[in-house]
From Swiss-Prot:
May be involved in transcriptional regulation. GO terms for cellular component: nucleus. PROSITE patterns: ZINC_FINGER_C2H2_1, ZINC_FINGER_C2H2_2. GO terms for molecular function: DNA-binding transcription factor activity, RNA polymerase II-specific; RNA polymerase II transcription regulatory region sequence-specific DNA binding; zinc ion binding. The keyword Manganese does not apply. It comes from the Eukaryota. It is found in: Nucleus. A zinc finger (C2H2-type) spans 109-131, 137-159, 165-187, 193-215, 221-243, 249-271, 277-299, 305-327, 333-355. This is Zinc finger protein 391.
Amino acid sequence: MESLRGNTAQGPTNEEDYKNEGQLSRQTKCPAQKKSSFENTVVRKVSVTLKEIFTGEEGPESSEFSLSPNLDAQQKIPKGHGSPISRKNSKDNSDLIKHQRLFSQRKPCKCNECEKAFSYQSDLLVHSRIHGGEKPFECNKCGKSFSRSTHLIEHQRTHTGEKPYECNECGKAFSRSTHLSLHQRIHTGEKPYECSECGKAFSRSTNLSQHQRTHTQERPYKCNECGKAFGDRSTIIQHQRIHTGENPYECSKCGKAFSWISSLTEHQRTHTGENPYECSECGKVFSRSSSLTEHQRIHSGEKPHECRVCGKGFSRSSSLIIHQRTHTGEKPYKCNDCGKAFCQSSTLIRHQHLHTKE
């Protein structure tokens, strides 16, 4: 049995060593990884042996299973006498079983609530917290709780300001690896989420969901103050700040405050002059991704914003709003000098020049 416990650091390294020494490294390796034909033979035999030791199932070899045809009779392992190795290598074997599931895609751990399956019991335990509402991981700064320790770690970075994930292209840093992955699609142009209705593609699944509501006209998020409905949750949160007057995001350069962090980020580019969004057709650059999207419609001819009254299409939502005033008669822009009203702010500005000339 001592020969089976050979030193892993100085154990045999080739077939000749095995023949001469009759030893076997105790390191458990995965058969799915590439190896020489000799290594594959040894690992396959080790896997069968471990299966017999831990499950009692007999492998394809004889009941008295030898690790190598060159091992003498004293080095053979009789069935039922594997307990010392079992105790010694139980952790190695469990790690091997877990690792092999990556290749087999076997998911034996099934949720009783929703039938979702997992490779490991630990993953099932974490998943079950969705149904039970359990959030055992609490932030010691603000008291917010989470169902996963990884979510707590990510949250704590909002307090520490730590951003360990950096973009290799532009150097921008993020607190979450998922945010970095999403950001990198700006550089690669990858848009894996495609609309089944019109074929338009998006870099984020949330953007696809929001877009699909332009086809369904679904607006599930309703404001309790004014009854206005929205297609996505983030927009209603931003809208509600109109009622509360909350502007939590302040510019460190000029002190101007904003209700939305993306608005602050876009505003800060007026100080830095940064224009990170470039049109692939003509090379024109923009400080906002939305401005680039609207500009690209000049090249594509896309007009996704359609008037429900007359069916006329527009490339910008703001252009549709202005157009709709021709149907409603609304003229929200009024001249302070003569009281004349206009449906567009630009028309009011042109009109006011008449008074200044006078």
